[in-house]
């Protein structure tokens, strides 16, 4: 058991989504013991800016049968049995950070929509995050009605009715609604049981060519490190298919920017995996699920400060195409989501600049042609993606980018 435990990798990614300050990070801490806001600005402002990952083990008590994430049952003190390891992706709920949430959404196998019981439902980002889940086609959703310690029974029931009304006709229509207090750990066992029942581990084919979406990239060298001690750049993200091994040669697309005749172009790069980290451990092989860190031979200058975020990693010659222009079959929403007042979505116009989220990448696209339910765009930064993939489309309204629909990449 001890040996197996050492190398356990999370097998499913669960997004924590919802309006700013409704308790996503507190709930992640209640489930995992990890406070995911570690960015200095996050601690100062009390909101999540970057995407945080934290793992937890889903366990069941062999004595009382209750679920928890702890080796010893918090309810009766007996040992618990390991079921599976899951990874929580804590997304920003602040409206200015919606595009960051969409990048994380592309890695989610399920989601917990956190809704505070002490505020009217829905709040703007509650609506926006649910729409984001709908756009990416995510149906494995649980609703955590949080902060029930702040309201009386009547208020909690009124809020429950508002939630039921809000989810009618959406992908979350049949989602279980679980009242909890993340702060006091109340009803967390019921939530963990719901995760086990409603967010299954997807069937994955490890024989497919590996593909990893890069969410973060780092230079882990401290200033003043002597040259012989420098280590290569690190890529952080999630494997969506296949597996990666230490020693593998990998290609990164669209790669790194360079200038040619005054224009910025991108060139794919190849490197070797020198180390792999999953679940906080160094491993020889990594699979889909959880955050994976790849140590490479890349110049750390290329990976510092998330410069490689939005790239796709795989075996050389096996990755999807890189697009500098996209043709999309467009599906627009009726109304703009995320704004306090309801606005109708205007049709897309020629020469309009839209923000596109493609996997973990985001890029601006200039609309060059319009057809019936189709548009063509010239991209500011190229993207690596499969034909048929979904792309979230946002438009600038006022000073913010607002989700207005999605597109499907056409050949």
Curated annotation (Swiss-Prot):
Instruction: Report the SS bond pairs.
Output: none
* Annotated source species: Pyrococcus furiosus (strain ATCC 43587 / DSM 3638 / JCM 8422 / Vc1)
Which residues are GTP-binding?
Answer: 21-26, 146-149, 181-183
Binding positions (Mg(2+) 1): 25, 48
A single GO cellular-component term on record? cytosol
Q: What name does this protein carry?
A: Translation initiation factor 2 subunit gamma
For this UniProt record, give its keywords in alphabetical order, as a comma-separated list.
GTP-binding, Hydrolase, Initiation factor, Magnesium, Metal-binding, Nucleotide-binding, Protein biosynthesis, Zinc
**InterPro entries, from UniProt?**
EFTu-like_2, eIF2G, eIF2g_C, eIF2g_dom_2, eIF2g_GTP-bd, P-loop_NTPase, Small_GTP-bd, T_Tr_GTP-bd_dom
Domain of life of the source: Archaea
| Matching PROSITE patterns | G_TR_2 (PS51722)
Query: What residue ranges carry the coiled-coil annotation?
Result: none
- Region described as G5: spans on this chain: 181-183
Q: Where is this region: G1?
A: 18-25
Q: Which cofactor does it need?
A: Mg(2+)
The UniProt gene name for this protein comes to: eif2g
Annotated region G2: the residues are: 46-50
* Similarity field: Belongs to the TRAFAC class translation factor GTPase superfamily. Classic translation factor GTPase family. EIF2G subfamily.
Give the EC number(s) under which this enzyme is classified: 3.6.5.3
Gene3D superfamilies this protein is in? Answer: P-loop containing nucleotide triphosphate hydrolases (3.40.50.300), Translation factors (2.40.30.10)
Mind telling me which NCBIfam families this protein's record contains? Answer: eif2g_arch, PRK04000.1, small_GTP
Record's function text? eIF-2 functions in the early steps of protein synthesis by forming a ternary complex with GTP and initiator tRNA.
Stored PANTHER family: EUKARYOTIC TRANSLATION INITIATION FACTOR 2 SUBUNIT 3 FAMILY MEMBER, EUKARYOTIC TRANSLATION INITIATION FACTOR 2 SUBUNIT 3-RELATED
- Keyword Metal-binding assigned to the entry: answer is yes
Q: Where is the tr-type G domain?
A: 9-203
């Amino acid at each position: 058991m001890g040996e197996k435990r050492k190398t356990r990798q999370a097998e499913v990614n669960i997004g924590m989504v919802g309006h700013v300050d409704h308790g996503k990070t507190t709930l992640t801490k209640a489930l995992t013991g990890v406070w995911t806001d570690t960015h200095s600005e996050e601690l100062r402002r009390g909101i999540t800016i970057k995407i945080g990952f934290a793992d937890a083990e889903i366990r069941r008590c062999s004595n009382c049968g209750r679920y928890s994430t702890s080796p010893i049952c918090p309810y009766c003190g007996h040992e618990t049995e390991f079921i599976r390891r899951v990874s929580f992706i804590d997304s920003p709920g602040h409206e200015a950070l919606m595009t960051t949430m969409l990048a994380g959404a592309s890695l989610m196998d399920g989601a917990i929509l956190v809704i505070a019981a002490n505020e009217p439902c829905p709040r703007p980002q509650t609506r926006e995050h649910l729409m984001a889940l709908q756009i990416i086609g995510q149906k494995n959703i649980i609703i955590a009605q949080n902060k029930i310690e702040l309201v009386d029974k009547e208020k909690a029931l009124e809020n429950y009715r508002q939630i039921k009304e809000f989810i009618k006709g959406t992908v979350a229509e049949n989602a279980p609604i679980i009242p909890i207090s993340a702060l006091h750990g109340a009803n967390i066992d019921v939530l963990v049981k719901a995760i086990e029942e409603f967010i299954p581990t997807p069937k994955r084919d490890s024989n497919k060519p590996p593909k990893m979406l890069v969410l973060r990239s780092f230079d882990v060298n401290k200033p003043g490190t002597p040259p012989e001690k420098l280590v290569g750049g690190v890529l952080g993200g999630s494997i969506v298919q296949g597996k990666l091994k230490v020693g593998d040669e990998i290609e990164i697309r669209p790669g790194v920017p360079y200038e040619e005749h005054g224009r910025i172009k991108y060139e794919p790069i190849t490197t070797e995996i020198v180390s792999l980290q999953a679940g906080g451990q160094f491993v020889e092989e990594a699979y889909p699920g959880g955050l994976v860190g790849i140590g490479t031979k890349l110049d750390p200058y290329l990976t510092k400060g998330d410069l490689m975020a939005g790239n796709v990693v795989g075996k050389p010659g096996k990755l999807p195409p890189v697009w500098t222009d996209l043709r999309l079959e467009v599906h627009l929403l009726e109304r703009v989501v995320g704004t306090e007042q309801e606005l109708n979505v205007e049709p897309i116009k020629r020469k309009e600049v839209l923000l596109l989220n493609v996997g973990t990448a985001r890029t601006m696209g200039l609309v060059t042609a319009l057809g019936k339910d189709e548009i063509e765009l010239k991209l500011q930064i190229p993207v690596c993606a499969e034909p048929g993939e979904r792309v979230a489309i946002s438009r600038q309204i006022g000073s913010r980018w607002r989700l207005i629909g999605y597109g499907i990449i056409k050949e």
